[in-house]
Design a protein with these regions (language model features):
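Outer-membrane beta-barrel architecture
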Residues: 63-67, 90-92, 129, 173-177, ...
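Outer-membrane beta-barrel channels and translocator barrels
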Residues: 88-91, 125-127, 137, 171-174, ...
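Hydrophobic, lipid-facing positions within transmembrane beta-strands of outer-membrane proteins
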Residues: 50, 64-68, 78-82, 114-118, ...
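Short strand-turn segments of transmembrane beta-barrel domains in outer membranes
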Residues: 39, 51, 56-86, 96-97, ...
Length: 271
């Protein structure tokens, strides 16, 4: 699998364990870091195919910057994004929003998405700073199946949210971070039906969540050396059910919660 991180925090569906690409929007990103190849030793089994880390935006220069982008193209495709970035003394903020839609190049292939992101930061001193952010996005997607085997009413209604908080320190010979993150999702999916079949009598629903606390401190004791110690805790899980359309009855599916934690010490020396 491929692990996606936002500011170092894992991002995937807490019940099924897979990433959700439509929740990772360009309006969040200052830059994207890519680690190619297996990285399970550092990041766990989800990183067998590599790691993508999205680093969120921050206003570095004093003042206010506003930006708006609008694009329109084939198949009634619309892409919009606006952002406001502020840096005033020790305080900084980023607020962004976006709306995107398309009819798709085939019937029953519509896609619509809207979302918003906000980040606030404060520098207590040259060495200590704190920041927190929140992102919520909702998208509606339709899947027409293949041309040979079309699908009807295969529609998804998905809402994803994330929030995080971090306290950071940066000194000449040591640096570290204490951070908290919380991700959640609400999914409503109609699996659709093929030609000759009857429409679905129930729809899939799920709620999932993932949260964690991470602490590490890294220090350079002498030339070429770096020692890092830390602790990670993660909780993830959720529940799923099918809702019967005729009666509103809820048929339970999976209800699972898991916790994991680990401490570590890493010693490196350049030779």
């Amino acid at each position: 699998g491929l692990l996606v991180l936002i500011d170092g925090h894992p991002q995937y569906m807490g019940l099924m364990g897979h990433p959700i690409a439509d929740a990772y929007q360009s309006m969040l990103a200052e830059r994207v870091e890519v680690l190619r190849g297996p990285a399970s030793v550092l990041y766990g089994s989800n990183a067998m195919g590599g790691v993508i880390n999205i680093v969120t935006r921050k206003q570095q220069e004093e003042g206010v910057k506003n930006n708006m982008q609008v694009g329109y193209g084939s198949y009634n495709t619309l892409q919009t994004e606006f952002s406001n970035r502020v840096k005033k003394g020790c305080f900084s903020s980023v607020v962004t929003g976006s709306y995107n839609r398309t009819d798709g190049h085939r019937p029953d292939m519509e896609f619509e998405q809207y979302g918003g992101y906000a980040k606030l930061g404060y520098d207590f001193s040259t060495f200590w700073k704190v920041w927190g952010d929140i992102n919520v996005t909702h998208f509606n997607a339709s899947n027409p199946g293949t041309v040979q085997t079309p699908l009807f009413d295969n529609d998804s209604r998905i809402t994803r949210g994330m929030t995080s908080f971090a306290l950071e320190n940066h000194y000449e010979k040591t640096s570290g971070t204490l951070s908290f993150f919380y991700n959640w999702g609400r999914h409503k999916i109609n699996d659709g039906y093929k030609t000759g079949e009857e429409p679905q009598k129930s729809h899939f629903n799920s709620k999932d969540r993932m949260l964690g606390i991470s602490w590490y401190q890294s220090a350079t004791l002498f030339t070429g050396n770096r020692v890092t110690t830390g602790f990670d805790y993660q909780h993830f899980g959720g529940e799923s059910w099918n809702k019967v359309l005729a009666t509103g009855e809820r048929k339970s599916g999976v209800d699972k919660q898991m916790d994991e934690f680990a401490g570590y010490i890493d010693f490196r020396q350049d030779i």
